[in-house]
Amino acid sequence: TMAIVGIVPEHAYDENYGQNPIGSGRYLMKQWDKGQQVIFEANPDYYGEEIKIKKLTVLFMDEDAALAAAMAGQADVAHTAASYADQVIDGYQLLRVASVDNRGINLPTVSPQERNGKPIGNAVTSDAAVRRAINIGIDREEMIDNVLNGYGTPAYSVCDKMPWYNPSAQVAYDPDAAKQLLEEAGWTQGSDGIREKDGVRAAFSVMYTPGDSVRQALAEDLANQLRELGIEVTTEGAGWDVAY
């Protein structure tokens, strides 16, 4: 965390810093209407090259609203999901920006239990064989093509492309090996195609944040792919307060 903290004046770094940030960058925050917009103005004391854009207004919009604003010519730049990359808007050009941001799934690694008065864990994903099978049984390239319109790269960890990324985390897509892992671990297919072990059905839910079309589409694609392995996944839109 400290590696990404900018130069901050000591007198301004207190409990109110998050509401009134001060730094040495190109812009100063002049107005923040929470949940609506934030307005920046050029920093007259900026040490670098001359700032050509003197004022920036960032509007907080969901993906659909951002796309609609661009179509109506109400925004100079609109950030939207790769799932909308096939949209053509007069007067705009599509820019693909390299990023270390990725979208993955978090799976419980402990068996069902209670901690601090709250239930945690999962009887299916606590089996390492299931997690390994999912890792090699998911076709990431298919997800990129079908969900992201080809705008993306496969991810194998939470830190792909970062300096500390370990290339050995990368795995080859091998659905046959994934099925073999599950068989060897005792997860056998039932008459409906879904696996079971010791009376536990290979089924769990995956949550995504409402309003995030990419997370939703990835979750649904994941469910379709895992069913081919004999794992049943249901998808559910829920806020972070519910998911965590």
Model-flagged regions — what are they?
Residues G150-Y151:
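Short, glycine-/polar-rich solvent-exposed loops and beta-turns at beta-strand/coil boundaries
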